[in-house]
Amino acid sequence: SLRYKDWFEKAAHDLRGAEILLEHDGGNDLVAFHCQQAMEKMLKGWLLKTTGELLDGHSLVFLCRKATAAGAPLKGNLRDCAYVNQFYIETRYPSDSYMPVSEEEARDCMDAARKLMELLA
């Protein structure tokens, strides 16, 4: 969609899904994944609103850098984006080297997503 509000709504929906999963022991890997999705959609929506451009890709680091360059107050959030970004692929597919996501990591992802969404709202 080229309507930034659609991206913001989907981001909020993903964050709410992550909150429900965390509250009801629905899987820390799914919490981390939905936090990544919320952050990605919020960044894409903000960039669409600000620049008129809908960017491709899933890298939170790339999107955070683009948003910062476009004036978003995210200089201190690049580390959070890099942290949550690591869970995007790792949590989606089975792997021989799979490392489970701890509750602490899931909560850290949740904190990062909430912080980013507050800054860009």
Q: Could you say what each language-model-derived stretch is?
A:
Residues S1-A121:
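Terminal alpha-helical segments
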